[in-house]
Swiss-Prot record:
GO biological process: positive regulation of growth; regulation of DNA-templated transcription
UniProt keyword terms in alphabetical order: Toxin-antitoxin system
UniProt-listed InterPro entries: Arc_rbn_hlx_hlx, Ribbon_hlx_hlx
Function: Antitoxin component of a type II toxin-antitoxin (TA) system. Upon expression in M.smegmatis neutralizes the effect of cognate toxin VapC41.
Entry superkingdom: Bacteria
Annotated gene: vapB41
Organism: Mycobacterium tuberculosis (strain ATCC 25618 / H37Rv)
Keyword Protein biosynthesis in record: no
Protein name from the UniProt record: Antitoxin VapB41
């Protein structure tokens, strides 16, 4: 996934230097650093386990037709479309 981050200049220089010293791509160095940072706990405390939440149940008038059914593929396509609209600055899919 591509994303844009606004990082301090000194941080980017350090990442570039590390990548050059290790003969690696910057994206690989950043990925490694993010994974390492996210796997560490703060102040020695264990990472909390995710808690279960209860989502609301939405009742509909009837069963969805095959064209209306929300398959994983349709959800992924809708999310990609929404992200593309967001990046283009036109959020027509806003609720």
């Amino acid at each position: 996934m591509k994303t844009t981050l606004d990082l301090p200049d000194e941080l980017m220089r350090a990442i570039k230097v590390r990548a050059a010293q290790q003969g690696r791509k910057m994206k690989d160095v950043v990925t490694e650093l993010l994974r390492s940072g996210l796997s560490q706990t703060h102040s020695g405390a264990p990472i909390p386990t995710p808690r279960r939440v209860q989502l609301p149940l939405v009742h509909c008038g009837g069963a969805a037709t095959r064209e209306q059914e929300m398959t994983p593929e349709r959800v992924a396509a809708a999310l990609l479309d929404q992200e593309a609209q967001w990046w283009s600055g036109h959020d027509d899919a806003a609720l």
